[in-house]
């Protein structure tokens, strides 16, 4: 039965996405992280790195214990209630539909010829400056975001959800939220965010690399370039400043036949990141559509293979 929970959650996300009227649990994790930061930063006697470690432990521990308590309480109430709560918690941990909606908004603006609107929409997906991007720059930023978030927002929580249920998925979401809030190499967070960044790197190590296999499978199904996926990853994945993000980004670049990376601007400061991909194909609205299709098919493959392995394992343990 456990192997059915994640597919049910995935289907629910495809149908509903993230309801705007309901406060997403990730926001609660973010508020908890902000409160923990204020608490431990206020303890002046603590070294910043230790304060950051304690913050990460409190946030991750509280999140996992809360999720476990909700699931156990629901199952004690009724087995069906336990299943429903588990599926809902898993549903809130993944975001393929939300990623598709953001990518679609950028694509539709480009198709309509509204570059300014496209810049505004892609700014909701990336942290770089978007005000001066041309059409190709907007498309590149959107594709890079879809690629990276295929791992961060879909396959990684799928991986931990399949392995450890709702608690595993939310262990990952708490880690990822901490990294997005504190994992910066600036004066404020270089020491405080050290633990959050390192733990997120650890949590993403396997999922990011397994995502490459899913992208290659999706590229085969979509008649793109599965061989290009592996060539691109071999040549460029480790060049990325992140130990993990380069894998899905290089995989997408290879499958779509484009190059990602290059010059980016953050707060008015231009930064050059390594170029990923083998061919310099044009990037436009159509490329964004291709990236979103790749994301969906790769996610379904990842989930289906994981659920199948879990089913086989459960049957072998029963026999």
Curated annotation (Swiss-Prot):
Similarity field: Belongs to the CobD/CbiB family.
Keyword vocabulary terms for this entry: Cell membrane, Cobalamin biosynthesis, Membrane, Transmembrane, Transmembrane helix
Subcellular location: Cell membrane
Primary role: Converts cobyric acid to cobinamide by the addition of aminopropanol on the F carboxylic group.
Gene name as annotated: cobD
Transmembrane segments: 57-77, 80-100, 152-172, 210-230, 294-314
Pfam families from the UniProt entry: CobD_Cbib (PF03186)
Pathways involved: Cofactor biosynthesis; adenosylcobalamin biosynthesis
Main location (coarse class): membrane
Organism field: Chlorobaculum tepidum (strain ATCC 49652 / DSM 12025 / NBRC 103806 / TLS) (Chlorobium tepidum)
UniProt keyword annotation of Transmembrane present: yes
GO biological process: cobalamin biosynthetic process
Name this protein carries in UniProt: Cobalamin biosynthesis protein CobD
Entry's Gene Ontology cellular component terms: plasma membrane
Membrane topology designation: Multi-pass membrane protein
GO molecular function: ABC-type vitamin B12 transporter activity; threonine-phosphate decarboxylase activity
């Amino acid at each position: 039965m456990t192997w059915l929970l994640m597919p049910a959650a995935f289907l629910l996300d495809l149908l509903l996405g993230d309801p705007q009227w309901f406060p997403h649990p990730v926001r609660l994790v973010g508020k908890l992280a902000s409160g923990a930061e204020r608490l431990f930063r206020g303890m002046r006697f603590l070294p910043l790195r230790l304060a950051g470690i304690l913050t990460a432990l409190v946030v991750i521990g509280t999140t996992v214990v809360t999720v476990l308590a909700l699931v156990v309480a629901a199952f004690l109430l009724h087995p069906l209630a336990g299943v429903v709560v588990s599926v809902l918690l898993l549903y809130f941990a993944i975001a393929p539909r939300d990623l598709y909606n953001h990518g679609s908004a950028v694509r539709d603006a480009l198709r309509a010829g509204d570059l300014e609107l496209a810049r505004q929409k892609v700014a909701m997906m990336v942290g770089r400056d978007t005000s001066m991007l041309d059409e190709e720059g907007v498309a590149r930023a959107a594709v890079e975001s879809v690629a990276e978030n295929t791992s961060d927002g879909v396959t990684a929580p799928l991986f931990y959800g399949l392995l450890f249920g709702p608690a595993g998925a939310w262990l990952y979401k708490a880690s990822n939220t901490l990294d997005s809030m504190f994992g910066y190499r600036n004066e404020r967070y270089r020491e405080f965010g050290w633990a959050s960044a390192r733990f997120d790197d650890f949590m993403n190590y396997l999922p990011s690399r397994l995502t490459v296999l899913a992208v290659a499978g999706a590229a085969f199904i979509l008649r793109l370039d599965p061989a290009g996926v592996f060539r691109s990853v071999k040549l460029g994945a480790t060049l990325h400043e992140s130990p993990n993000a380069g894998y899905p980004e290089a995989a997408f670049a290879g499958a779509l036949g484009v190059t990602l990376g290059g010059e980016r601007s953050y707060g008015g400061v231009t930064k050059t990141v390594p170029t990923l991909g083998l061919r310099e194909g044009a990037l436009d609205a159509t490329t964004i559509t291709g990236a979103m299709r790749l994301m969906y098919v790769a996610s379904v493959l990842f989930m289906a293979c994981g659920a199948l392995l879990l089913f086989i394992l459960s049957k072998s343990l029963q026999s």
